[in-house]
């Protein structure tokens, strides 16, 4: 079973990437000044400022909380091809947060953000392909997107990419990622590595990982150890 999660919204990332003067005011909690500066840049077409302004409206910082204006500026930023805004808006449509749930719109926005190499969009788009949400189920596309996100350091993508490669019977690729997971302390990877190395007929390695899994209390690993007679290796 894949350990997918829906991660949160990232309007704050655009806020932090915008005008240095506006960011300085925000960090100093001078929200009124930050709002004024972001608003000026947003009206000039700065998509990062538009997304930041959406965040301020959404949270009532430096201005009265206004969900309608927050959505207006987020959509403007997304229409301006801002990857983080496309991701935020896509996730809102995917979850039905403050908007009517619309998986088709979510898929389109996450695809645009993913094409701009947004790791969070790639991860959640992979989930949509995996579940067939607003698209056909496509394990190969799931793997491609997960690997793209994993290479960028997306932790949950890294935890899942090995599993999807196992489903695709690409055991060499699976072992590469599962080894990384195991090195990072993911005990569930121990048993999966034992399975993978049995499939690859690398029984000496399978024995090592099966034993680690047994030591961590996995009864399935003990059965695997016995089934493949790993004590011989």
Please identify what each model-predicted range represents.
Residues 4-13:
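Sec-dependent N-terminal signal peptides
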Residues 18-44, 59:
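Alpha-helical segment of the N-proximal tetratricopeptide repeat
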Residues 19-25, 52-59, 90-95, 99, ...:
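Hydrophobic face of amphipathic alpha-helices that form TPR/SEL1-like repeat modules
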Residues 29-36, 64-73, 100-109, 135-147, ...:
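Structural signature of tandem alpha-helical TPR/SEL1-like repeats
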Residues 40-41, 76-77, 112-113, 148-149, ...:
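Canonical positions in the second alpha-helix
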Residues 43-46, 59-61, 66, 79-82, ...:
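Short helix-capping/linker turns of helical repeat alpha-solenoids
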Residues 199-233:
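Terminal, low-structured helical/coil segments at or just beyond the last alpha-helical repeat
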């Amino acid at each position: 079973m894949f350990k997918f999660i829906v991660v949160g919204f990232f309007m704050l990332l655009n806020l932090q990437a915008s005008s240095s003067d506006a960011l300085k005011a925000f960090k100093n909690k001078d929200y009124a000044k930050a709002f004024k500066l972001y608003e000026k840049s947003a009206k000039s077409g700065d998509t990062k400022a538009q997304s930041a302004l959406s965040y301020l409206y959404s949270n009532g910082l430096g201005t009265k909380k206004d969900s309608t204006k927050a959505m207006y500026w987020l959509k403007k930023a997304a229409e301006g091809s801002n990857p983080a805004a496309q991701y935020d808006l896509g996730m809102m449509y995917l979850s039905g947060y403050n908007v009517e749930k619309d998986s088709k719109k979510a898929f389109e926005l996450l695809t645009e953000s993913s094409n701009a190499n947004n790791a969070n969009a790639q991860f959640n788009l992979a989930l949509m392909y995996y579940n067939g949400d607003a698209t056909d189920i496509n394990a190969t596309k799931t793997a491609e997107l997960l690997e793209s996100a994993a290479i960028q350091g997306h932790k949950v993508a890294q935890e899942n990419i090995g599993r999807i490669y196992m489903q695709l019977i690409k055991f060499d690729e699976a072992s590469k990622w599962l080894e990384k997971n195991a090195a990072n302390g993911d005990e569930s990877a121990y048993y999966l590595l034992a399975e993978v190395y049995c499939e690859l007929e690398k029984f000496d390695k399978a024995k090592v990982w099966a034993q680690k899994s047994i030591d961590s209390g996995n009864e399935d690993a003990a059965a695997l150890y016995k089934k493949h007679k790993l004590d011989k290796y």
